[in-house]
Design a protein with these regions (language model features):
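ATP-dependent carboxylate-amine ligase catalytic core
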Residues: 2-114, 122-149, 158-162
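Residues that mark the start of a beta-strand
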Residues: 8, 36-39, 245-247, 273, ...
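Short, surface-exposed amphipathic charged segments that create phosphate/polyanion-binding patches used
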Residues: 78-79, 185-200, 289-293, 367-369
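C-terminal and late-domain segments of enzyme folds
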Residues: 111, 242-244, 256-268, 273, ...
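A short helix->loop->beta-strand "cap" motif at the edges of active sites that frequently abuts
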Residues: 116, 173, 320-324
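Internal gly/pro-rich beta-alpha loop/helix module
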Residues: 128-240
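Phosphate-binding active sites in nucleotide-utilizing proteins
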Residues: 244-320
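Cysteine-nucleophile active-site neighborhood
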Residues: 274, 298-378
């Protein structure tokens, strides 16, 4: 097997909220400004953090998830996505050892699968040498993790930094960065986490973070850590030589922005030409053979989505003509008859799915699931099993008695077993988030269905 050197480092945290995304954005911008081609990755299924990565690095950011993409393919997948970059920075998820059940897709698991060294971010606010005890615990917990050092965050003063550094020296943990507390260094939040970059302009904040990182992180030392990683399998271009055989419309705007770039690339690798359109701003779907509606925040744009009757009619007409339509989460909500917002207001939506979606104050589902098809769908025949992820605040309430449930689902953070999604011969809509890079057969099946429909037009 051919191998190539890919300098890479995981920026992990002790827990959520320690400043991983902020620091990674600063690192990406700083290395980019110094002339490095830097490629970013995010552990887990999160859609929002990679958007900040992209602004900072100037490149698409890719998710690394051992549930959505088979673990044995992750190294090759990673190498392919790293491409020609001379440095890869991987942002962890939650705490270093947190993930799904039995550590599935934890930062530690991904780091070991990729042979990537780890640097731990510690929020040092309101602690001194105790930070060293935390670092020692993380270092000792799993000796197979290549623990290389720490970045100290939210330090209050020179004296505060000195105390923490002295503690790290006692246990032999290198301090690669020491960042001072700065209220300007944060990202806006929403009920799913951070606010997407499609709704905010983080450029000024990233510039502030970049300057802080350049002066407070030893970028040369961090690069040496990344360069210590062993060579990896040579990358593979999955789209090379592929003949385009069908056009698929992809809904993309402020309301629908949750797409894994690798998932879209997987559709292209199967012969799809992707054509982007906006359910918010356009009056009709493009001339295509199939439609994809990703997740996002349609609940924040209900007035505009509801008032764009021309677009809704265009989608309904496509459905009546049996055009293949695939939707995830926010896309499912939009395809329903009505959406009830957080305040109880009701908005008319497309009406392809005979159900209403109701926003709830509490999170309804979160976690990794296995979805087994209860009937033939756009992604495969009855019995096809898919690995996906759910995270939503709304509930779907069918308006017909004989509702054609798409999947039987098992899993979640609180393990459950339930039916979900909607499936007909030409529509598949559910709360399930998939990465087609890990479901290539599903991607092929959908592209095949779109191509077949195109021949009937």
């Amino acid at each position: 097997m051919n191998t190539v050197p890919i300098p890479r480092v995981v920026i992990a945290g002790t827990n959520s909220g320690v400043g991983k995304t902020t620091i990674v954005a600063g690192l990406l911008a700083a290395y980019r400004a110094s002339g490095h081609g830097v490629q970013s990755f995010k552990v887990g299924p999160d859609y929002i953090d990679p958007g900040f990565h992209k602004i900072a690095s100037g490149r698409e950011s890719y998710n690394l998830d051992s549930w959505l993409v088979p673990p044995d393919t992750l190294p090759t997948f990673f190498a392919s996505m790293a491409g020609d970059a001379d440095l890869a920075i991987i942002e962890g998820v939650m705490g270093l050892y947190d993930g799904g059940r039995e550590g599935v897709s934890s930062t530690a698991q991904i780091a070991k699968q990729l042979g990537a060294p780890v640097v731990l971010v510690i929020d040092c606010k309101a602690m001194g040498e105790s930070a060293a005890a935390i670092a020692m615990g993380f270092r000792e917990y799993d000796k197979d993790v290549d623990f290389k050092g720490v970045i100290l965050n939210r330090l209050g003063s020179d004296n505060h930094e000195r105390m923490v550094r002295e503690g790290m020296e006692k246990i032999g943990v290198p301090v690669i960065g020491a960042i001072r507390r700065d209220d300007r260094m944060h990202s806006p939040e929403r009920h799913l986490g951070l606010t997407p970059v499609t709704e905010v302009d983080p450029t000024e904040a990233i510039a502030t973070i970049q300057h802080a990182v350049e002066s407070m992180v030893d970028l040369e030392a961090l690069y040496k850590v990344a360069a210590s990683a062993a060579p990896m399998p040579a990358p593979i271009d999955i789209t090379k030589g592929v003949t385009k055989r069908t056009k698929i419309g992809v809904a993309y705007d402020e309301a629908f922005s949750f797409y894994y770039p690798a998932s879209l690339s997987a559709l292209e690798a199967q012969g799809a030409e992707l054509v982007y359109f906006s359910p918010l701003k356009d009056s009709a779907i493009p001339d295509v053979d199939g439609l994809v509606f990703g997740g996002g925040f349609p609940e924040m744009f209900l007035q505009a989505l509801s008032e764009n009757t021309a677009m809704k009619e265009s989608i309904s007409k496509a459905n009546q003509c049996s055009m293949p339509i695939y939707a995830e989460c926010g896309g499912l909500m939009y395809l329903c008859e009505h959406i009830h917002d957080f305040d109880g207001n009701v908005f008319d939506t497309v009406g392809v799915v005979p159900a209403n979606c109701v926003m709830q104050q509490k999170l309804q589902k979160v976690g990794y699931v296995t979805a087994t098809a209860k009937r033939n769908t756009l992604l495969g025949n009855t019995g096809t099993a898919l690995h996906g992820h759910e995270f939503h605040f709304s509930t779907m309430e069918p308006t017909i008695e004989e509702f054609p449930w798409a999947f039987h689902l098992e899993g979640g953070r609180k393990p459950q077993s339930y039916d979900g999604g909607y499936a007909t011969d030409n529509v598949l809509a559910s709360y399930l988030h998939l990465n087609f890079a890990g479901s290539l057969e599903g991607a092929k099946h959908f592209v095949d269905m779109c191509e077949a429909f195109g021949h009937t037009k």
